[in-house]
């Protein structure tokens, strides 16, 4: 929103949440600021939109009306309209399973499933080889302060896992 003429080759919107309303004044203002990136896409550009929320799904429908833009729906919740989605630890596309994310410690959870879906589509859109992208997932080290394992304590009634997610910007993002 600080670069009104920003026109990427690949634009990604994962989700919208009301945690930035102080900056945008309203949810509608926030959505409009995010949508501006898609308005500026040139023919042949790719719009990657998470469709797990109703606002995001509505934006995906709008993006699909732009004939010159390749619009790709992604989901962290196995949304049936998504071209790439996460389900029970696996990343899928319309041809079937892509990669078992549950076997990759740094890519656990539906939120990382959605992140992986976006990365997968973005990389392919940029010309990367499908198998190279799949291999890259296995070597992903994770990001500092983002779901970074700190340690575990085992006890009589189970165990507690400590995770550093200090970059989470709201309570919903940090509740895992």
Say what each PLM segment does.
Residues 2, 6-160:
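Acidic, Mg2+-coordinating active-site environments of NTP-dependent enzymes
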Residues 166-176:
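AMP-binding/adenylate-forming catalytic core of the ANL superfamily
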